[in-house]
Swiss-Prot record:
PROSITE patterns: PCI. It is found in: Cytoplasm. The gene is eIF3c. One of its GO terms (cellular component) is eukaryotic 43S preinitiation complex. Residues 639-815 form the PCI domain. It comes from Drosophila yakuba. Component of the eukaryotic translation initiation factor 3 (eIF-3) complex, which is involved in protein synthesis of a specialized repertoire of mRNAs and, together with other initiation factors, stimulates binding of mRNA and methionyl-tRNAi to the 40S ribosome. The eIF-3 complex specifically targets and initiates translation of a subset of mRNAs involved in cell proliferation. Residues 882-891 have a biased composition (Basic residues). This is Eukaryotic translation initiation factor 3 subunit C.
Length: 910
């Protein structure tokens, strides 16, 4: 091997070195190393190691800046961190399968907590410098925007922040060492090739666990200045590439030794703890900080009420702290309850422990927007009902939030316990709704969760009984409202049977229960929100059971429509649901006009699904931000409380058809005709614009086809389009008494088709026989007579009834089609002329109409005297006005002549 790669000894002279270099001159001489560089061992680092090392160094810098509250540098370091993470993304997606490293998520969580802490400290913010204050606002905005992509990872991290990955263990080890090598070391990546180093012998107990580590460690004797090193180098660097590889320093080797020693010590401690266990059973060892289960009481301790309460206070004092094991806290409380029951410390102590267990279960889920786990839900129901049964069974226990902690009494009756079962049951109800929203509504999970409503209502009943015995009016109103909200949307068939006298009059129905609960709230409530929600639920329940007049009177007397805009979103949603159900009730009770008025505000917007909180429209996704969408999803109603939107739209369109089609026929040639229903009118016009219309398929197409048939007076085709097998399945079978609704619809279609027929063809007939109309529309003769009489009285139809002959005599006062079109044409031409005259006046100007015109005024006056250059525009306007007056006078003469002819006819008949 060439002597270029060998190190010369200290005894060699400089002249000999020069000779060696001169004789062995080649290309490799440019890469010759000094003695210091040769001592450094070199290894190849992967891209993952480089990227992770860059991330961890920036994270450590951010932590240092946070300690001294250097916010501008924290901001710049955060920007560097985001750029470094962007560079590391390809490595993360390849090596970690796209899973964000835990140490990076921990850094984001700590940074978010730091910003929130500084931001909430208002006094401290006032003392910040201008630069720090500005940087804090910028940093807060950037962090909030950036962590939106890591919401799921952050939520999982916050559920178990104590668990540390191997990467984080190395980061902690580096920070604890405090050496310079720790600043630049890699956190989260183990070296691909361990360097040889000396390792001390492990303890005897830990020897089996350290076999792998001991295999990797080899003892090397090194002397950098001996001649053997040069010979070793000669043998070691057989390859040119090996010469240029970076090697770890001795300092880094020592750091690695320290880390491994710490891990070994931790393993030894865990193993000793397992060996010292009396039962000798296996224990699952979790990563991260291991917390020993505290002992409840000493063996010889005398367990009494003060001792148990002190232990309870000790357990609950850890509530809300960062490293509290919430599962262990619940287990300790259950154990404490069992100890209390074994030593018969009294029911009051048991109630207190029960209430703290409920609080601990609620605290387990840190994110209040997410539903709790099913195991905790079942446990919560059980503990809640157990506590309430104890309260109801012992009348000498008073549990209230007004009881101060120093005034609690557990030894002598009456017992006073601080707590609020009402707040607990309200939270229970909210958690039940969250569980329902989390499930797929078309799965069996939703059905199984819905079965829990029986237990929830039973729990509410227990709380209601307790507060009826000892509670304020405000507390009773709150618990009554909770019961109302579980009752108002449920249909009770006993109500309709009671109306038909099919059940005894003493039978208690849901309407009676609602009346009792709501009337108490009307009388005793002092908050507007509870009373408003009770009224809305009461109206909804009345409307569901066809109590149209009671529901309508409640709406009119409460004036809800005047101040509902000032209510909270949940109350506005309930108001929309009430109006929708009220419209359905009016339709079932044959009040088509009222049904249309109730539903028009919901349907004209085009988004009834959002207004009723039954889902979000994907078409409007760009109109709302992610935060708004999250809030709106939290407001959604559970699926079993939804109102069928297709049924709602069908009722609205059918009501609009029954009102709009006769109105269109009556005002066919009226240029100023207004639209009763804009939505229905648009559907009708879009169908008329189509060149080829096929048979109807959807619900809307069926209604439009029925409307076209009604315009021709064909009631049979109209009824067939509205009431058929497909429409029955989609819409009408959803009503409670569907046969009665179908009969009502057919009757209305006949009546409105008759009205449309008379409006459309009145100018064709001289007289029409009433029996023939009754036969044509399959209506009783008195009904036809009544319809025509109303039309004549309301001046909708210019005709008279001849009772002896049972005919309707038309008066032909309405213009024919040609006359109506001619009158429309004249009006439009007149309007066009007026517009042109105004435009011409604006172009000419009005200079000569001013008072001070000088000599030109005399000349103009002379011309006017000679009828030259007169006001010809004014003359034309006067002429047009005279023509209009003549047309009006001519029309008045015609009307007068017709009236005289009618009087003559009546005299002749008499």
């Amino acid at each position: 091997m060439s002597r270029f790669f060998a190190n010369g000894s200290d005894s060699e002279s400089e002249s000999s070195e020069d000779e060696i270099q001169a004789t062995n001159f080649n290309k490799a001489s440019a890469f010759q190393f000094s003695d210091d560089e040769e001592e450094v061992k070199r290894v190849v680092r992967s891209t993952k190691e480089k990227r992770y090392e860059n991330l961890t160094s920036i994270i450590k810098t951010i932590r240092n800046h946070k300690k001294i509250k250097d916010i501008p540098n924290t901001l710049s370091s955060f920007e560097d961190l985001t750029r470094a993470y962007q560079k590391a993304l390809p490595v993360i997606s390849k090596e970690e399968n796209g899973i964000t490293p835990r140490f990076y998520i921990r850094c984001l969580a700590e940074l978010e907590d730091f910003i929130n802490e500084v931001w909430e400290d208002r006094e401290g913010r006032k003392n910040l410098s201008k630069n720090n204050s500005k940087s804090l606002g910028t940093l807060r905005q950037k962090v909030r925007k950036y962590i939106k992509d890591f919401e799921d990872d952050l939520s999982r991290f916050r559920e178990a922040p104590d668990q540390e990955s191997e990467a984080e263990d190395e980061v902690v080890a580096q920070e604890s060492d405090g050496g310079d090598a720790g600043d630049d070391s890699d956190a989260g990546v183990k070296p691909t090739e361990a360097a040889p180093k000396a390792v001390k012998s492990a303890p005897a107990k830990a020897a089996p666990a350290d076999d792998d580590d001991s295999d990797d460690s080899i003892d090397w004797d090194s002397d950098s200045e001996s001649e053997t090193e040069s010979s070793d180098d000669e043998n070691q660097y057989q390859n040119m590439r090996e010469r240029f590889l970076k090697r770890t320093t001795e300092k880094e080797e020592k750091d690695d030794d320290k880390r491994k020693d710490k891990r070994k010590e931790q393993k030894v401690k865990i193993r000793k703890r397992a060996e010292d266990d009396e039962d000798g059973e296996w224990e699952t060892v979790v990563k991260g900080h291991v917390v020993e289960k505290p002992k409840m009481f000493e063996k010889d301790a005398e367990i009494d009420v003060p001792l148990v309460l002190a232990k309870l206070l000790e357990i609950m004092s850890a509530r809300g702290k960062k490293r509290t094991d919430r599962r262990l806290q619940i287990d300790l409380l259950f154990e404490l309850r069992d100890i209390s029951d074994q030593h018969n410390l009294g029911t009051a102590v048991s109630v207190k422990i029960h209430f703290n267990i409920i609080s601990a279960i609620y605290d387990y889920n840190q994110k209040i927007s997410e539903p709790m786990k099913l195991e905790h839900w079942a446990l919560l129901l059980e503990v809640m009902q157990s506590m309430l049964k104890l309260l109801l069974a012992n009348t000498d226990i008073i549990m209230s939030e007004s009881v101060a902690e120093e005034h609690e009494e557990y030894v002598t009756a009456p017992f006073y316990v601080r707590g609020c079962p009402l707040a607990a049951v309200e939270r229970l109800d909210d958690e039940f709704v969250k569980l329902l929203k989390e499930c797929d509504p078309h799965s069996n999970d939703y059905v199984s969760r819905l079965k829990d409503e029986v237990n929830v209502v039973k729990t509410i009943e227990l709380v209601l009984q307790y507060f009826e015995r000892s509670g304020t009016n405000n507390e009773r109103c709150r618990i009554y409202l909770r019961k109302i909200e579980h009752l108002y949307y449920k249909f009770d068939p006993e109500v309709l049977k009671k109306k038909r006298n099919e059940v005894p009059a003493t039978t208690s129905t849901s309407v009676d229960v609602m009346d009792k609960l709501c009337k108490f709230i009307y009388a005793k409530d002092d908050t507007d929100r509870i009373r408003t929600r009770a009224i809305l639920a009461h109206i909804y329940h009345h409307a569901m059971h066809d109590n149209w007049f009671q529901a309508r009177d409640l709406v009119l007397m409460s004036h809800l429509q005047d101040n509902i805009d000032a209510a909270d979103p949940a109350t506005r949603i309930l108001y929309n649901r009430m109006m929708a159900n009220l419209g359905l009730c009016a339709f079932r009770q044959e009040n088509v006009k009222d049904a249309h008025h109730c539903l028009v505000d919901l349907m004209v917007t085009g988004k009834p699904k959002e207004l009723l909180a039954q889902g979000l429209l994907p078409q409007r996704q760009h109109e709302r931000s992610a935060e708004q969408e999250k809030i709106e999803k939290q407001r959604q109603m559970p699926f079993h409380m939804h109102i069928n939107l297709e049924l709602l739209e069908c009722v609205y369109l059918v009501s609009a058809m029954l009102l709009e089609i006769p109105y269109i026929a009556a005002h066919e040639f009226d240029a100023r005709r207004r639209m009763i229903s804009k939505t229905f009118y648009q559907q009708l016009r879009s169908s008329e614009r189509q060149s080829l219309v096929g048979p109807p398929e959807s619900m809307r197409e069926h209604v439009v086809a029925a409307a076209k048939a009604m315009r021709c007076g064909n009631w049979q085709a109209c009824a067939n389009f509205i009431v058929n097998k497909k429409m029955n399945t989609k819409v009408w079978d959803l009503f409670y008494e569907s046969d009665r609704v179908r009969e009502m619809l057919t009757k209305f279609i006949k009546e409105e088709s008759l009205r449309t027929y008379l409006f459309t063809y009145s100018n064709v007939y001289t007289s029409i026989s009433i029996p023939s109309l009754a036969q044509m529309y399959e209506l009783p003769v008195p009904k036809v007579h009544s319809i025509i009489s109303k039309m004549i009285i309301n001046e909708e139809l210019m005709a008279s009834l001849d009772d002896p002959s049972e005919t309707v005599v038309m008066h032909r006062s309405e213009p024919s089609r040609l006359q109506a079109l001619a009158m429309q044409f004249v009006d439009k031409v007149t309007n066009l002329v007026d517009v042109n005259e105004k435009v011409f006046d604006m172009k000419q100007g009005n200079f000569f109409q001013r008072g001070n015109m000088g000599n030109r005024g005399d000349r103009g006056y002379n011309r006017n005297q000679n009828n030259q250059g007169g006001n010809w525009l004014g003359q034309r306007r006067d002429r047009n006005n005279r023509n209009r007056n003549q047309r009006g006078h001519h029309k008045n003469n015609q009307d007068r002549q017709q009236q005289q002819q009618q009087q003559v006819q009546t005299i002749d008949e008499e």
